Design a protein with these regions (language model features):
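N-proximal low-complexity "stem/linker" segments adjacent to membrane-targeting elements
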Residues: 1-23, 168-221
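Short, acidic, metal-binding catalytic loop of nucleotide-sugar glycosyltransferases
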Residues: 22-31, 220-229
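Short beta-strand/loop segment that forms part of the nucleotide-sugar
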Residues: 32-41, 230-238, 259-262
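A conserved acidic beta->alpha catalytic loop
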Residues: 37-46, 236-245, 286
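Glycine-rich, basic loop-to-helix element that forms the pyrophosphate-binding segment
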Residues: 60-75, 261-277
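Short aromatic/hydrophobic "clamp" motif used to bind/position activated sugar donors
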Residues: 80, 282
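Conserved donor NDP-sugar-binding/catalytic core segment of glycosyltransferases
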Residues: 87-116, 296-328
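Conserved nucleotide-sugar donor-binding catalytic segment
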Residues: 110-181, 339-425
Length: 427
């Protein structure tokens, strides 16, 4: 009975894919078809590979989540078997019944190495997959998270673990990027923190201009928190891309408020949001960046004991670099430092942040100052910090929950040469 359709995903090395395809001979009596989702096509295509089953190649350079979800709707076999990147089947699988009951439609495999352990879908009932789509690639920081988040969101009662080691890795590829991605995925487990005080209250505000490629990642990172933000508030600053189209889907979310206005720069966009803030503190998030899943939890732990004369809490940044293929690579963690005077503030080596403002302090300062330099469209963060530092203290804590994406369209890259002129203006 040929009732299994195999999906091979994220194989970047042709020889690895050939080995994975050859290993499917172990399930040949059950194997109906194989589909390779190939972001490197035609690089990994092997026309000379002769195997006793049909193989389709799907170009997945576009959004892998969309491509997968659409393709799964066309599958007619009872089961889908997933193989990822460096996986191949081993002989032991011949002795394992690859069947699932209706109340246990998911079988997982367990991965473990010196850096982390995790599980991913292995065999899933096609009928269940069709009703339970994957997140889109534009909703997650990196494509591997599509599968981590899918399995984490599922009820444990629907899952059965594979019996024994049915797969092995063709090669281990330990690197700092893979390690950082796994650590991020682990934070998605959504542990319950019932004993964490929900006071003081915390919102997040996002100003967006033409970041349609990344906006959903930023918003989803605010939604998928281990404890929720008290308020998520987003303004589109006159984008000319499809950002407003993406924002439409969030307008019915109970904890998200979405606004749009004509383009006047980030400072005016953030000021537009201030009257709608209802929380004691607010985190500023750029539309091309994203948060760790435990961001609210960690921030609130520090806010509980913060002195009244502190108007700003800040910590460290985790930097990632966007490459031409659309994937991201880990760059570094830049640790913050304590600011004791104005000179140290203006000589800070990188943007001070992440910035968690006391809302009342922002309102007393009448929001982000609109200055003549570049029509107030640059360095609004530095301007407000200089104003706040005259009257209040800042608090640095050693925590890392904010992910900065460096890409071709980053404003800080485009306008780095303006920084010295801006500093002269402040002095």
């Amino acid at each position: 009975m040929k009732d299994i359709h195999v999906l091979c995903i994220n194989y970047n090395i042709r020889s690895d894919l050939r080995k994975a395809l050859s290993s499917l001979n172990y399930i040949l009596p059950r194997l109906n078809k194989v589909t390779v989702f190939d972001s490197q096509y035609p690089h990994t295509f092997s026309p000379d590979l002769k195997l006793p089953f049909d193989i389709d190649y799907i170009n997945s350079r576009q959004d892998l989540g969309i491509t997968l979800n659409n393709y799964i709707q066309t599958i007619e076999n009872e089961y889908v078997l997933f193989l990822f990147t460096n996986d191949l089947l081993v002989d032991k699988i011949k002795g394992i019944p690859l069947t699932l009951e209706d109340d246990k439609p998911i079988m997982t495999v367990y991965y473990e190495n010196k850096d982390a352990h995790y599980k991913l879908p292995f065999i899933v009932k096609t009928s269940f997959l069709k009703k339970s789509p994957f997140l889109l690639e534009r909703e997650v920081p990196f494509r591997e998270l599509i599968f981590h988040s899918w399995i984490i969101d599922k009820d444990e009662s629907n899952i059965v673990a594979s019996k024994g080691n049915v797969i092995e890795r063709i090669r281990e590829t330990p690197n700092i990027t893979a390690k950082e991605k796994l650590e991020f995925a682990h934070k998605l487990k959504g542990n319950s923190y019932k004993n964490v005080p929900f006071i003081p209250t915390l919102s997040v505000m996002i100003s967006n201009f033409n970041m349609e490629k990344f906006l959903s990642v930023a918003i989803q990172s605010c939604i998928k928190q281990t404890i929720p933000f008290d308020q998520i508030i987003v303004v589109d600053d006159g984008s000319t891309d499809n950002s407003l189209k993406f924002l439409e889907r969030y307008k019915t979310h109970p904890n998200i408020q979405c606004f749009s206005k004509s383009n006047e720069g980030k400072a005016k966009a953030l000021n537009y949001l201030l009257p709608f803030l209802t929380s004691e503190f607010v985190l500023e998030l750029d539309a091309d960046d994203w948060l760790d899943p435990d961001a609210v939890l960690l921030i609130k732990k520090y806010l509980i004991n913060i002195p009244q004369n502190v108007s700003l809490l800040y910590g460290n940044f985790r930097y990632w670099t966007q490459n031409s293929s659309g994937d991201i690579g880990f760059s570094k963690i830049r640790k913050g430092k304590i600011i004791r005077n104005r000179k140290e503030l203006l000589s800070y080596k990188f943007p001070l942040g992440p910035r968690i403002y006391r809302t009342s302090s922002l309102i007393k300062e009448k929001g982000f100052p609109i200055i003549d330099f570049k029509e107030g469209r640059l360095y609004e963060d530095v301007t407000i910090l200089v104003h706040l530092f005259k009257k209040y203290e800042f608090c640095y804590e050693d925590f890392t929950i904010y992910n900065v994406r460096k890409h071709a369209g980053s404003i800080t890259k485009k306008n780095h040469s303006d920084w010295n002129d801006f500093r002269k203006l402040l002095n």
